[in-house]
Amino acid sequence: MDSDASLVSSRPSSPEPDDLFLPARSKGGSSSGFTGGTVSSSTPSDCPPELSSELRGAMGASGAHPGDKLGGGGFKSSSSSTSSSTSSAATSSTKKDKKQMTEPELQQLRLKINSRERKRMHDLNIAMDGLREVMPYAHGPSVRKLSKIATLLLARNYILMLTNSLEEMKRLVSEIYGGHHAGFHPSACGGLAHSAPLPTATAHPAAAAHAAHHPAVHHPILPPAAAAAAAAAAAAAVSSASLPGSGLSSVGSIRPPHGLLKSPSAAAAAPLGGGGGGSGGSGGFQHWGGMPCPCSMCQVPPPHHHVSAMGAGTLPRLTSDAK
């Protein structure tokens, strides 16, 4: 009995576990850290004032909230678990919706998807047929229709070829009309096309008269000095030829200048593209395939005046009229 009474009496007098833990925690709080205090106490108000002040000081020194050490990772894990649960819920709801759909509804959904895909393929085939119609091989002897990939590759090559051709044409036109290769229209065109009547001036007076009015270098792109020199040379060649009298030169002086020929002032005022140009190496104008001569005389052939129809008796009369 005494032992039992002593045991009963000793129980209230014995310290509680919390009373034993708090002094030890207050003594070793600065050395062992605050993790144990945070775990054991649910809120800072449950701790003594000195312990809570120490915890606040330690948390303030570390620059974190008392609940950040333990609550940060928990919040992240909870957010990730929430997102995963949301996605799984959406997937399960979709599956439930499909499962809840009846067989006629599923069949209707399949038909709708199939009709949409069929319309898309129909539009694609129409577009491919329209592209095949404008391809270079469309009117050729091909017997089978190209596939979609082959059609697209052919269209790409065709576009590249046309682009290169256009760039080459632009380069040739800039060389012809640029004006930086030659200062005036070269004499290759005139020498080949318009100087042929000069050697036959002694045999054909009409051709000589035509050459007098249409000299070898007559293009309006020529400078005034070059045009005047060419006209003087042509007149000298005609006058030195063995012609019957000076009647033909008088006819040349009576006739007005050709309507297509421009005066030196007009030629200087309206040059064609800043002067003619030719190929840089040869220095002469070359007629490229499909590109006519840019001068007005080559574009519009002059009307031929039949001077040879005039008899020998009319020439002295014209000479007397001129006098």
Curated annotation (Swiss-Prot):
Q: Where is the composition biased (Low complexity)?
A: 77-93
User: Where does the record place Polar residues bias?
Assistant: 1-13
Q: What induces it?
A: By SHH. Also induced by NKX6-1 in the developing spinal cord, but not in the rostral hindbrain.
- Record keywords: Cytoplasm, Developmental protein, DNA-binding, Nucleus, Transcription, Transcription regulation
Give the region (Disordered) as residue ranges: 1-107
Keyword Nucleus attached: yes
Location (main, coarse)? nucleus
In what tissue types does this protein appear? Expressed specifically in the brain.
- Pfam families the record matches: HLH
GO CC, one annotated term: transcription regulator complex
bHLH domain boundaries: 108-162
Q: Which domain of life is it from?
A: Eukaryota
| Nucleus keyword on record | yes
PANTHER family, alphabetized = BASIC HELIX-LOOP-HELIX PROTEIN NEUROGENIN-RELATED (PTHR19290), OLIGODENDROCYTE TRANSCRIPTION FACTOR 2 (PTHR19290:SF32)
Assembly and interaction partners = Interacts with NKX2-2. Interacts with ZNF488.
**Which comment does the entry carry about domains?**
The bHLH is essential for interaction with NKX2-2.
Return the protein name.
Oligodendrocyte transcription factor 2
Species source reads Mus musculus
